[in-house]
Amino acid sequence: DAIYRNSAQDYKQFQLVSNLDAKISKSVRFSLDILGRQEQRKRGIYSTPYLFTYFLSTFPGSAPYYPNGLPRVGYDGITRNAAIMVTDLPGSNNYTNNILNIKPLLHIDLDFITEGLYAEGYAAIDYTFSDGKQINQPYDLYYYDNATQEYQNKRSDTGQISLNDWATRYSTITLNGRIGYERTFNDVHKVNAFVAYEQSKYNYHTLSGYRTNFLSNTLMDLFAGSDVPADKDNGGYSDATARVNFFGRVNYSYKDKYLAEVTMRYDGSMNFAPGHRWGLFPSFSLGWVMSEEKFFEPVKPYVDFLKLKASWGQMGNDNISAYQYLSQYAFTGTGAYFGSGDGAALNKGFYLTRTANPLVTWETANTTNLGFSASFLNGMFSLDFDWFKSKRRDILITRSASIPTYSGLVLPAENLGKVNNSGVEIVASYRDRAGDFEWGITGNFTYAENKVVYMDEAVATPEWQRTTGNPIDGLVLYKALGIYQSQEQVDNTPHMDNAAPGDLIYQDTNGDGTITWDDAIRLNESATPKIVYGFTLNGSWKGLDLNVFFQGQAKAVQLVQPTMNMVTDFYEGRWRTENTPEENLNARWPKAFIKQTYGDTWNGSASTWWLRNAAFLRLKSVEIGYTLPKAWTSKIGIQRWRFYVNGNNLFTFDKMKICDPEVGTSKDDNGYAINSNGILAYPLQRMITFGTNITF
């Protein structure tokens, strides 16, 4: 597998799986699952999201090579030549992951005490050992010097040979034990209950060494690097977290008609200070199978199943930065000199990076759900409907907005934030057959939206920019009203400095006669879709089978600001002085401009002009298969033999065309955002797969 013609990427995996199931006695069962895996990865020093950002942000006229074959400098005038960055010329990143998962489980039936009683316990042990080397090295890039008419090598600007050698180990050990009871009384009362205890502990440790100024890249070990203090560095980091959970559930049904369930959790986390570590989280649900009632019998030929359901539950979240109840300090490499002459010495010191909050505790989510499940005409049609509303409370946020930075305070996170989520989920299906032909369709539809109830905001924040009352990730940008057609229109309209015909017109939201960031507005829309849907079509006939899956979204927007390597869509239909007045009046884009970071402060700003409807319907997958007749395969000892061809991401119906409407923020290997422009995101891949399945 590769998506680059010449690249440094390579991946190998070796895996060993063992599953042992043993029935020791009539009442005792034991299982042991073992998974061992080694991953050997090799790539260049630049991750794929970064590479695609550079591919798509290179100036159109900046070819990677000169006509004589010499690699040229990138658009920054130094090193960013994406055609070289995919190779191992700038260096390599080689690492190995050794993964071991072990899960022994013991189940004991305790029917000799009372029927339906059992005990069960398991241990899940997950270990990962990783080590790797990242090597950076200088490489040849050239630029043409018009003065000397010679190609100048910029190798000296691409860095020195350096090595980062690291090793990491982390483990998660989980112990789980439960006592359960499952029994039916008089064929009408069904009870299923258990109480359980679980504890888990996570440990992480990494150690790294850095050296530079190697004489060559022949021997890349730490001892071969420079011994000058400025050319070397060592580092290490450890982390640990743990949880203890007591939980239980009681499920009861009467004649499979009246259903009730109660779940309780009592969870403790070391992420919180003593006195705030424990949280009690209950949940309740009720169900009524109305179709089992006698009064329902007249409609049973049409509605064979109808169940009403309702639930309420509370969940806790401790997935936060650990030890926020402790103050955090960092050691700086700078400080004050004390003494004079040869006796002067640099005294390094600590500085506060986080103030302790001893009251930090669980974030909570209270969720209410109402719905029904139904099937019609002996299962030919089925329908599931759920309405939900979730109130997230005690979300950790800081008061950094309402307390100005000049206060000098390093503020802690506090359990202050409030967000509401609500929506509906619908799943419907239809199936039928005629002779040897079977077919069916299943569709799902989800509408969900969120609204910030409370978020700390500066008092001076304009009402039209506030987060409160809007989605969490609502976009803030200028509202574009059109394109300036004449200098007279510019002079009579609030505008930024140096605005001219062909530039975008922005709304003066606060009415002060000037355009500043205070005029930007917060939208009730974002790249997160409010509507997600999909449907699957399937059918089979005499060994042939077909499965088609469509996926889509709606009520989402994508910001597609132009970048340096503007796609053709941004070029065609733009405002130009050479156009007729009618052409400019209907221009799709403002006049050509230099990107904001290179001088433009007007057209390149985030605005509704660059906002596009991100709704789409995608043919996500199609699979066609054929199963050979059993009469043929049984003669050669094969129980079932199927051939198939599968296609993924085959085509998409959308109005964007500029980029994939589903992409959002590109992220690097560590999950940090690289850009929020859909044009620069890693594209989806269309894949065609041929295969066969053989069962003996």
What does each model-identified segment do?
Residues Y65-Y66, L70, I78, S269, ...:
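Extracytoplasmic gating/loop element in the C-terminal half of outer-membrane beta-barrel translocons
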Residues Y50-N81, Q137-Q160, N203-D233, Y325-T355, ...:
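Surface-exposed loop/turn segments flanking beta-strands in extracellular/periplasmic regions
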